[in-house]
C-alpha cells in the first residue's frame, strides 16, 4: 500500500512538472506571437488600427492620420508593403522605387515623417507651453508642412515647440542629456494612455544639442500595446503589436543604436517626458 502511494505521489509530481513546463512554454510562445506588424496596406488592418487609436485619441486626429496613411499607401503600396498583421521580422523597403512613385504623383512635396504623424495624432492630447523653439533641424519638416498645407499657423508653432532642439553639454553621459530633455518636457503635460515614445539623438555640428530623431505613438490594447510610426519621409508606416512597453523600448533602442558618432552620446528613449533607462 505504501509502495502504491509512493508511486502515485511520484506520478503526480511528474504531472505537475509537465503542466508547469507547458504553461511556461505557452506563455513564451504567446509572447512571441504578440510581436506582429503591418504597413496598414489593407482595409482590415487600417480599420483595426483606427479602432484601437480611437479609444484613446480625438476622432479628428485619428481621421487625419488615417488619411495620410491612405495617401501614402495608395501611392506606393505596390512596393511590397504588408497588409494584414504578420510576424514582425527585420523589414527592408525599396526606398528608391518608393521615392520614384511618390515624386511622380506629388512633385516636390516630400510627404510626412515620424514627427509630423505623431503630432497629427497627439495634438489634442498634449498641453504645449508657449515657449521659444529652436527649429534649426526641422527644415525638412517645415518644408513638408508648408508644401503639403498640413498644419495651420498655431499647429505649426506647437509642432516646432514640441520637437525643438534642446541645448545640452559636451559629454557622452546619457544621464546628463536625459536630464536636459526631462527638464524641457517638464513644461508639457502628456497623456497617460496615448504616449509619445521618442528616440533622442545627440548632435554637435552647431553646439551640443538634443533632437527627437524618431518618434511614434504607443497606446494600450486589450492584451498588449500598439505602436504606430512613420519610419521616414520615404519609408512606410508601421503598426507594431507588442506584449509590453519594454518590448517596444527594446525595439527602438536596437533599431536606432547606430544614430551616433565620435564624441557623441548614444541615442536614448523618452516615454512622454521621462527618460527610459535601458541599462
Protein language model annotation of sequence segments:
Residues 8-10, 16-279:
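Cysteine-nucleophile amide-bond enzymes
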Amino acid at each position: 500500500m505504501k509502495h502504491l502511494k509512493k508511486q502515485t505521489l511520484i506520478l503526480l509530481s511528474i504531472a505537475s512538472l509537465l503542466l508547469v513546463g507547458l504553461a511556461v512554454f505557452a506563455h513564451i510562445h504567446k509572447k512571441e506571437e504578440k510581436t506582429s506588424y503591418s504597413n496598414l496596406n489593407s482595409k482590415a488592418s487600417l480599420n483595426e488600427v483606427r479602432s484601437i487609436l480611437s479609444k484613446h485619441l480625438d476622432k479628428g486626429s485619428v481621421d487625419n492620420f488615417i488619411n495620410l496613411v491612405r495617401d501614402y499607401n495608395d501611392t506606393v503600396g505596390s512596393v511590397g508593403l504588408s497588409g494584414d498583421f504578420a510576424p514582425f521580422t527585420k523589414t527592408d523597403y525599396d526606398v528608391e522605387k518608393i521615392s520614384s512613385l511618390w515624386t511622380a504623383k506629388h512633385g516636390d512635396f516630400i510627404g510626412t515623417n515620424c514627427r509630423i504623424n505623431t503630432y497629427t495624432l497627439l495634438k489634442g492630447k498634449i498641453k504645449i507651453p508657449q515657449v521659444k523653439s529652436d527649429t534649426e533641424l526641422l527644415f525638412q519638416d517645415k518644408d513638408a508642412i508648408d508644401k503639403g498645407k498640413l498644419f495651420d499657423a498655431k499647429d505649426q508653432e506647437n509642432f516646432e515647440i514640441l520637437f525643438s532642439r534642446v541645448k545640452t553639454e559636451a559629454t557622452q553621459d546619457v544621464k546628463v542629456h536625459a536630464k536636459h530633455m526631462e527638464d524641457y518636457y517638464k513644461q508639457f503635460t502628456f497623456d497617460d494612455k496615448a504616449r509619445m515614445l521618442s528616440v533622442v539623438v545627440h548632435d554637435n555640428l552647431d553646439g551640443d544639442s538634443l533632437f527627437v530623431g524618431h518618434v511614434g505613438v504607443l497606446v494600450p490594447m486589450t492584451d498588449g500595446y500598439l505602436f504606430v510610426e512613420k519610419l521616414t519621409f520615404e519609408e512606410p508606416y508601421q503598426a507594431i503589436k507588442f506584449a509590453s512597453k519594454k518590448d517596444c523600448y527594446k525595439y527602438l533602442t536596437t533599431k536606432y543604436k547606430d544614430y551616433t558618432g565620435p564624441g557623441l552620446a548614444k541615442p536614448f528613449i523618452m516615454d512622454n517626458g521621462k527618460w527610459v533607462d535601458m541599462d
